[in-house]
Swiss-Prot record:
Catalyzes the reductive methylation of 2'-deoxyuridine-5'-monophosphate (dUMP) to 2'-deoxythymidine-5'-monophosphate (dTMP) while utilizing 5,10-methylenetetrahydrofolate (mTHF) as the methyl donor and reductant in the reaction, yielding dihydrofolate (DHF) as a by-product. This enzymatic reaction provides an intracellular de novo source of dTMP, an essential precursor for DNA biosynthesis. It catalyses: dUMP + (6R)-5,10-methylene-5,6,7,8-tetrahydrofolate = 7,8-dihydrofolate + dTMP. GO terms for cellular component: cytosol. Its EC number is 2.1.1.45. Pathway: Pyrimidine metabolism; dTTP biosynthesis. Homodimer. It is an enzyme of class 2 (transferase). The lineage of its organism: Bacteria, Pseudomonadati, Pseudomonadota, Betaproteobacteria, Burkholderiales. It is found in: Cytoplasm. This is Thymidylate synthase.
Amino acid sequence: MRQYHNLMKEVLAKGVQKSDRTGTGTISVFGHQMRFNLADGFPMVTTKKLHMKSIVYELLWFLKGSTDNNWLKERGVSIWNEWAAPDGDLGPIYGYQWRSWPAPNGQHIDQISEVVETIKKNPDSRRIIVSAWNVADIPRMALAPCHAFFQFYVADGKLSCQLYQRSADIFLGVPFNIASYALLTHMVAQQCNLEVGDFIWTGGDCHLYSNHLEQVDLQLSRDFLPLPKLNILRKPDSLFDYEFEDFEIVGYESHPHIKAPVAI
């Protein structure tokens, strides 16, 4: 994933030092885009090991509409532990906004279901969009949405997806987010009888935390390995019926994991 390495290099070369909410400090650039042709392989970084189990379970959790961290903990996924309340509640974060966006009439909007139906019935629509950025609900969220807005696009029988990530923790978060939305694109494409096209990642505040710079240097020193392939082993009745066991990553070889602190 040369595109990802190029982003880290750009931030190191051109970034400005900024303070941040966590008090850690960052080097940051504003505005960057990466494009991945999903037919070329599944975009998992190979210059450090990614925890695919967490990626899959978190996406399934979002699609369930859940905001209860206990569901993840029961499956051995700890990525939301630092932000969860003692009872596991995370407030109206991604899953709630995706599946139950509150409407003025007191009802709720299932954005994901609407997107799938629009792709099937009106694939040329320019409104195939899901937003997690609900301004009214942000004060009640454990963490404001970083990957805030995504749009699907259909052309030549292929489904593409573009994500806007307003805040991008390049070393820890971005590889995870790329793999998650690439997986979602594969799933939606299967449900809509389409092939996969491109995944486009667009970042706003793209930053490296000051306590990740040694890890970044180590990762940039490593050689790329071939991208793996994603196999989806069955086609469920709906997008909401996938199970963890339905996904197989074939041929994923990577350099060792690089540990880095999470900025909270």
